[in-house]
A protein has these predicted regions:
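Short acidic-hydrophobic surface loop/beta-edge motif
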Residues: 4-10
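Flexible "cap/lid" subdomain of the alpha/beta-hydrolase fold that forms the substrate-access gate
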Residues: 2, 14-15, 27, 63-99, ...
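A short loop-to-beta-strand scaffold at the N-terminal edge of the catalytic core in hydrolase folds
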Residues: 11-19
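Short glycine-aromatic motifs
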Residues: 2-3, 53
Length: 287
């Protein structure tokens, strides 16, 4: 199954996207998370395209070959929602099945909430409906048996507060070596971590993600998850674009909340699927 490269341009934003399958097929749009690319959906693009769907996976704003912006506000869900509406409209279909992972999940939930007429069904991997706002709103999801409040006041979400309080330091730490960071992040979950605090619960105490190690550790690639060539591709665009855009998705909580307050009825009438990842300890939302 051929995967095609495409570029949609509007007056306000450029969206690079990968596509597969017949253009007359039922449309599926898949949105990636932090810090990824449309390439993250390479296996699903081939599989779903072979089933006869027209499958589209964009580089989200701030990533890859889509538009990159220099102010935090450009990465609000309000702006990202407009990107998706424009891209969807350009594809000439009445509705689509929307699938999102990680930060791509609030994107598809918001399409379902704000534009239900454009959503035949919605699916989210790892992030439930209602996330994407300020991390203060996530405290009710912290399992205090794992994260005693005295030691871990923000639980697994501590790293999100780090972006608000030390954005420049967080970006500098990641920009140091995106290739090493990709090798750390793109790997299977470890069953041995079940029931233990996630490392992200101590980000502020440790003054960053990797300060205690003296920089980003050099881990071997998890070849069951990603190839050397793919890791280099992710690192290439993260190096060119920097982590300013990807990390800015985390610091628009107030505006994201206001955006969703504009909706009168937040009941989804279309089919919806949420898939929780048992070994994703950072995004543990099942407490």
């Amino acid at each position: 199954m051929e995967i095609k490269e495409n570029l949609f341009k509007s007056d306000r934003h450029n969206s690079f996207y990968l596509s597969s399958g017949p253009e007359e097929g039922e449309l599926i749009i898949m949105t990636h998370g932090w810090p990824e690319l449309s390439l993250s959906w390479r296996h699903q693009l081939k599989f779903l395209g072979e089933l006869g769907y027209h499958v589209v996976a964009p580089d989200m704003r701030g990533y890859g070959r889509s538009s990159v912006y220099k102010d935090h506000e450009a990465y609000s869900q309000r702006e990202i929602n407009l990107d998706m509406v424009e891209l969807f409209t350009s594809l000439g279909k009445k509705e689509a099945i929307w699938i999102g992972h990680d930060w791509g999940s609030p994107v598809v939930w918001n399409m379902a909430l704000h534009h239900p007429d454009k959503v035949k069904a919605v699916c989210s991997l790892c992030v439930p409906l209602g996330f994407g706002e300020h991390p203060e709103n996530l405290m009710n999801t912290v399992n205090r048996e794992i994260y005693p409040v005295e030691e871990y006041p923000a639980g697994q979400w501590d790293y999100q507060f780090h972006y608000y309080e030390n954005f420049d330091d967080a970006q500098k730490e990641m920009d140091e070596d995106p290739y090493k960071l990709v090798k750390i992040l793109f790997r299977k979950g470890d069953p041995m971590g079940l029931g233990l605090p996630a490392g992200t619960s101590l980000t502020r105490k440790n003054k960053g993600w990797f300060a205690e190690f003296g920089g980003i550790p050099d881990f071997p690639i998890d070849e069951e998850m990603i190839s050397e060539e793919e890791a280099r591709t992710f690192a290439k665009y993260l190096t060119e674009n920097t982590f300013f855009g990807p990390n800015s998705w985390y610091v628009n909580g107030e505006d994201n909340q206001k955006f969703n307050e504009t909706i009168n009825d937040q009941t989804l009438e279309m089919p919806a699927l949420f898939v929780h990842a048992t070994y994703d300890y950072v995004c543990d939302t099942t407490s």
